[in-house]
Amino acid sequence: SDIEAARNKLVAEGIDIGNFIEGEGKDEDSGEIRTWKNLFLPFSLTRGLFTFLIQHEDGCIPSHKDKFDAAVTRLDHVVINTNDPEGIISLYGDTFGIRLALDQTVEQWGGRMLFFRLNHTTLEVIAKKNDEQPEDSLWGLAWVVTDIKKTYDRLISEGLEVTDVKEGRKPNTLVATVKSNTCNIPTLLIQHL
């Protein structure tokens, strides 16, 4: 399986990695069981970021089609801060085999920006070099929604604090920021037009 191949690759590179953890979940509405395997990666490898690999084995994630237009459909991008851009290129590009799609300096966004692509998700890295110990940290998450206005209305009706919908930085997008109930992780909703 893919997760076993990933574990074998890391072990072959001399990385001390644990064993798989089996998971199981039950859909309370349908009674359907779904199973998966997790492989937690050590902080010494991930440079302080809580990271694990997951492979779904059986069953499927429930689809709530009645609320689909007002729900998150997938993860769009993860924003990571680093003080060691070359180290993160080595980790994500060489060790994990994730494609570095773009490496550019954008002064108005804070410096060097790295964009890794994994399926339909982007790992956006904001690099600000300093002389401290290499460290990475999660800065934020961006979630794709089908209809941002319906999602906004649903979240507001459920008591969450959400900014008004506006045009995104990326052309042909609408965005809103979830300001509450995010465990202090900056959280963006994005609709691609």
Predicted regions and their residues:
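N-terminal beta-strand motif that seeds the catalytic metal site of vicinal oxygen chelate
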Residues: 1, 52-89, 139-141
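Short, conserved charged micro-motifs
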Residues: 2-9, 86, 148-153
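Vicinal oxygen chelate
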Residues: 3-70, 114-117, 124, 156-193
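Aromatic-anchored, glycine/proline-accented short structural segments
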Residues: 68-127
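Short amphipathic alpha-helical linker/capping segments at the junctions of internal repeats
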Residues: 101-103, 144, 163
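A short beta-turn/loop motif at secondary-structure boundaries
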Residues: 106-108, 131-133, 168-170
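Exposed loop/turn and edge beta-strand positions of beta-sandwich/beta-sheet ligand-binding modules
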Residues: 110, 137, 172
